[in-house]
Amino acid sequence: TRLIMVDDIAYFQADNKYAVVMTAEGEALLRKPIRELLDVLDPALFKQIHRSTIVNLKAIASITRDDTGKGTVKLKSRPETLAVSQPFMTLFRNM
């Protein structure tokens, strides 16, 4: 067991019944599903961007959208990009 500070979290990714927390330093497995995390995370800091992904808004470097309406999130502290499904793109249109 290790303590991860909220500010260090880049995003959460669903992994079957669990969630993986991703930080700049690596990753850790949580024994909670994504839907339970949504109930306890601060909605001002964390937003669901896909059915399997919750992102820390402070960790976002940029958000882009293609011609089909699909979005992509580029992170400040991680090399991967995250897909934003169309239903969740409305969150960013209103920001």
Where do the protein language model's features map onto the residues?
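Conserved binding/recognition cores within well-folded domains
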Residues: 1-81
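Eukaryotic intrinsically disordered, low-complexity regulatory linkers and tails enriched in Ser/Thr/Pro
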Residues: 84-86, 90-95
